């Protein structure tokens, strides 16, 4: 009887160990799949636009608030970092800067992480004109494609843009893409601030 109890206990321990090992392997596989789907480590996410009823999870892009003077960004056509933060202090109450894009100006972000399942791009904007968004997809050997992210009319004070996502899907972004760059341009005069990306355009 005691021998049978010990045998049953041993079998139970082996079964629990097997389940734990399988779970660990599944976790490793899930982590590998996530790494494969996302073009890099996007970092911590938050519901940055929750004050506007948007509960999606976004990560803050590299100098997306332009507090470091646009470090890593490339500006042309008069685009530049100026004093004056977006009025909702979305990223932080200590922020003091934003990006001005005059008519014909462009601003190109550093390489950014993204997800292949409909990445969403959102920011704050103000001014008078049209804000245009393009996405440059990069592979290991350079640019693979330039995609149209859409445009939005900007008229007045600071407000969140729509989520730019409709043409950025796994069908549009080329296989082998490792990172993206966001290219902002305008007709008129537009200010932008606090650029965020939702890697998976979570619902």
For every predicted segment, state its role:
Residues 52, 140-176, 185-191:
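Extracellular carbohydrate recognition and processing domains
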């Amino acid at each position: 009887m005691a021998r049978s109890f010990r045998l049953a206990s041993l079998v139970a321990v082996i079964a629990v160990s097997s389940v734990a090992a399988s779970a660990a392997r599944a976790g490793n596989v899930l982590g590998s799949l996530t790494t494969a789907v996302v073009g890099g480590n996007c970092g911590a996410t938050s519901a940055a636009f929750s004050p506007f009823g948007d509960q999606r999870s976004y990560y803050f892009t590299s100098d997306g608030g332009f507090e470091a003077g646009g470090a890593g960004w490339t500006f042309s056509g008069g685009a530049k970092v100026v004093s004056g933060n977006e009025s909702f202090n979305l990223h932080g109450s200590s922020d003091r800067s934003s990006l001005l894009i005059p008519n014909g100006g462009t601003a190109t972000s550093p390489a950014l992480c993204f997800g292949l399942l409909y990445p969403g791009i959102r920011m704050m904007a103000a001014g008078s004109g049209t804000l245009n968004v393009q996405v440059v997809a990069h592979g290991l050997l350079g640019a693979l494609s330039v995609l149209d992210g859409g445009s939005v009319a900007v008229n007045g004070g600071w407000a969140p843009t729509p989520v730019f996502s409709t043409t950025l899907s796994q069908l549009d972004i080329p296989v082998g893409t490792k990172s993206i760059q966001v290219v902002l341009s305008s007709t008129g005069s537009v200010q932008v601030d606090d650029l965020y990306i939702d890697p998976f355009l979570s619902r």
